[in-house]
Curated annotation (Swiss-Prot):
Natural source organism: Lactiplantibacillus plantarum (strain ATCC BAA-793 / NCIMB 8826 / WCFS1) (Lactobacillus plantarum)
Lineage of source species: Bacteria, Bacillati, Bacillota, Bacilli, Lactobacillales
Gene3D superfamilies in UniProt: Ribosomal protein L6, alpha-beta domain
Pfam families xrefs: Ribosomal_L6
Family: Belongs to the universal ribosomal protein uL6 family.
Name of protein: Large ribosomal subunit protein uL6
Cellular component GO terms, alphabetical: cytosolic large ribosomal subunit
Keywords: Ribonucleoprotein, Ribosomal protein, RNA-binding, rRNA-binding
Keyword Ribonucleoprotein in record: yes
Record GO biological process: cytoplasmic translation
Molecular function terms, GO-annotated: rRNA binding; structural constituent of ribosome
SUPFAM superfamilies associated with the record: Ribosomal protein L6
Subunit structure: Part of the 50S ribosomal subunit.
Function: This protein binds to the 23S rRNA, and is important in its secondary structure. It is located near the subunit interface in the base of the L7/L12 stalk, and near the tRNA binding site of the peptidyltransferase center.
Length: 178
């Protein structure tokens, strides 16, 4: 089932991967990431390659094998390139702005919605209808972007709301009169 787990991770120049028990640490030009991995999965670092092996072929081990490899690969990609999510505000009067370390959204509520920017992320507002969230942790970037989007997710009739730039919003037709 899991063929992803058997793929070898090639380490780019300047990236180090180390393991202490169940904790994997990846150091690279953009920073350092640590993560716990499953104790049953064995990770070996040989030169500039990282390989993963599993003890058995039961369903749970196959799932953990592929997931562990994907998580470590995302860590390697994060410390070399980083991850970015771009959001777009669609709607009359919908605006975003940065006030110090806070992201402030005006999205049709009676009050502005404020978010404290997490320490490990960079939030940019190039214009008042776009938000760029970037960082080295794929999960942290995705979680914060989803949290911002959940404030006013796109509705299907007019498409108003906060959406990812590459997201397709399925539209519905309104009621027809008699």
């Amino acid at each position: 089932m899991s063929r992803i787990g058997y793929k070898v991770i090639e380490l780019p120049a300047g990236v180090e991967v180390s393991q202490a028990g169940e904790v994997v640490t990846v150091k690279g030009p953009k920073g350092t990431l640590t993560r716990n991995i499953a104790s049953d999965i064995t990770m070996t670092v040989e030169g500039n390659e990282v390989k993963f092996t599993r003890p058995s072929d039961d369903y749970k081990m196959k799932a953990l094998h592929g997931t562990t490899r994907a998580n470590v690969n995302n860590m390697v990609e994060g410390v070399t390139k980083g991850f970015t999510k771009n959001l777009q505000l669609v709607g009359v009067g919908y605006r975003a702005q940065l006030q110090g370390k806070k992201l402030v959204l005006s999205v049709g509520y009676s009050h502005p919605v404020e978010f404290a920017t997490p320490e490990n992320l960079t939030v940019e507002v190039p214009d008042n209808t776009h938000i760029n969230i970037s960082g080295i942790g794929k999960q942290a970037v995705g979680d914060f972007a989803a949290e911002v989007r959940a404030v006013r997710s796109p509705e299907p009739y007019k498409g108003k709301g906060i959406r990812y730039v590459d997201e397709y919003v399925r539209r519905k037709e309104g009621k027809t009169g008699k």
